[in-house]
Amino acid sequence: LPRDVRAGGLAIRIRDFDRCAAIVVTSDTSIIQKLEQRIRGISVRAAAVTAELAELKHERVRETVSQLQREHAAPSGTATLLTAVKSSLNKMRQEQKTGDHSESLLQSADALRNLRHLQFLCWKDATAGLCSPAASPHTTAFATLPDHWRLMNRVQSERSQLANHLRWSATFDDAGSLQRDGWERAAADKTLFSTTTDVIPAGAGGRVLRLAAWPADPTGRSAVRDDVVPLVLTSPVVAVSPGDIVIVRGRVRRGSAVASGSRSPLLLYDTELGPEHGLKQELTSDWQEFELIRPIHRGREFQLCASVLTQAEVHLDDVQFHLIEAGTSETPVRMIGTSGR
């Protein structure tokens, strides 16, 4: 291996470090010999299995890219990577015929590495315009990226007239808006956390929603349980139908009244997908806009939940619910899991 002697030690650069690679540092060279013997013993099987995996992954990725290109231009570098993968697979097949299992394994690993890079490029391209990957339900897997772009194309076609799809909004202009609009509050046991949800002044005559939680024991001697959510505030119900698309927009920031050790103390999620697909942004004292795009699969009622995960103060404002009604049979909007594998 290339070695670079530096002050305090030795720097070694390892090329093509794969996910299954191993580094052994030992003064007993017999260990290396035993390891090499084990590798030779499984080399035939390892080469065959890795070759099969590379072939299957190439077919799956190629198929997904083909579907994606019907909805959106593939990112730069896609064609080059696919060409490199094909070249590696051709070399791998040739090495299998000659019985060079070690080289066959290296070519398979090279193909898999380029396929992972291609998947990452497509995912990065898909999430570039979102406030978070969690904003769209179809960015959680490479196989559903075609569904993501189909969803984005449908939303983009309505962007210019999104105001016409506004179903409900909350600007928290007065102290009674929470109760009047029908927000629901759920808090942890008072022996664990003290909490508040109220509307407070925010300069220039405006008001914002404040959510805050802090330990009930001011001395800090009581243990704070990680499995307890201090505060959850749930929005009023918005009626929906399967095939609709709900877009929730708003802005959020960190307050200063309660110190928090977490950079992401707030979880925003919806009743269609649940907290597992929630949005956790790193909050600062500056306002950050958020947007959740949710295709409705089977729900009839849709709500936004704002969950304070630890001691913190956060502010929420300008919450808007937009509803794009279900597409036609000619332009359907697919739900989670309807394409890909």
Regions found by a protein language model. Name each.
Residues A11-Q37:
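C-terminal beta-strand-rich structural cap/linker in extracellular carbohydrate-active enzymes
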Residues E36, A54-H58, S87, S102-D110, ...:
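Long beta-sheet-rich domains in secretory-pathway and surface-associated proteins
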Residues R38-E95, W123-H148:
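Amphipathic, heptad-repeat alpha-helical segments
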Residues L82, L89, Q96, H101, ...:
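Inward-facing hydrophobic residues that define packing positions of alpha-helical scaffold repeats
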